[in-house]
């Protein structure tokens, strides 16, 4: 779904991501930021192509010792603002990212593998559903990685990009700790 949308992403101004799921009873030794939100952080960094300059974050531990729900607001040097929510204590599973820019609005639903595009057409709004080939993202990531190893070509996500997403996730955790404990 993301691949179908990428061709339309030019200069994001606002991004909103929701990645919610029921309690997993596994992986609760790390916060929802490292377990769940990191996937959206990686995608947002790739789409915005700008450094975050401000981080506001709040996380709450509800059923496990680490944060089970978190919300972060990122302001980027480009002026883009991204608001991300991740939860592993939701009643339903939602995996969606919405992207707003001056010429269009994109809604990407990972779970249902759909992409909707809305554009201004004169005095009307033209909506279209983009063609998406249903795929399993984890299988795609592993296949792409194996292909990179076998062919000695760069992977789809470089080590630097993965490290940047991890570094941002760790900064978010520090901000959440500071808000929660004042340190």
Feature roles, as predicted:
Residues 1-27:
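A contiguous active-site-proximal alpha/beta segment in oxidoreductase catalytic domains
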Residues 36-39, 140, 160, 164:
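A generic structural signal for residues located within well-ordered alpha-helices
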Residues 41-114, 135, 139-153:
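Contiguous beta-strand/loop segments that form the cofactor/metal-binding neighborhood of enzyme cores
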Residues 77, 144-183:
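C-terminal helix-rich "cap/oligomerization" subdomain common to oxidoreductases
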Residues 26-29, 67:
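Short acidic, glycine/proline-rich loop/turn micro-motifs
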Residues 125-134:
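C-terminal "lid/loop" region of Rossmann-like NAD(P)-dependent oxidoreductases
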Residues 2-5, 84, 172:
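Hydrophobic packing residues within well-ordered alpha-helices of enzyme cores
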């Amino acid at each position: 779904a993301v691949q179908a949308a990428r061709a339309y992403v030019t200069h994001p101004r606002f991004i909103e991501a929701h990645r919610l799921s029921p309690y997993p009873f596994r992986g609760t030794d790390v916060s929802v930021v490292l377990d769940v939100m990191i996937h959206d952080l990686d995608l947002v960094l790739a789409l915005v192509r700008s450094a975050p300059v401000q981080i506001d974050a709040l996380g709450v531990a509800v059923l496990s010792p680490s944060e089970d729900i978190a919300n972060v607001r990122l302001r980027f040097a480009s002026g883009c603002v991204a608001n991300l929510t991740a939860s592993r204590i939701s009643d339903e599973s939602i995996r969606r990212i919405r992207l707003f820019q001056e010429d269009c609005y994109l809604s990407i639903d990972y779970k249902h593998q759909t992409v909707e595009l809305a554009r201004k057409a004169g005095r009307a709004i033209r909506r279209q559903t983009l063609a998406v080939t249903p795929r399993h993202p984890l299988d795609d990531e592993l296949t792409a990685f194996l292909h990179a190893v076998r062919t000695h070509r760069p992977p789809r996500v470089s080590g630097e990009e993965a490290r940047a997403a991890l570094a941002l996730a760790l900064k978010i955790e520090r901000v959440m700790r500071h808000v929660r404990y004042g340190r």
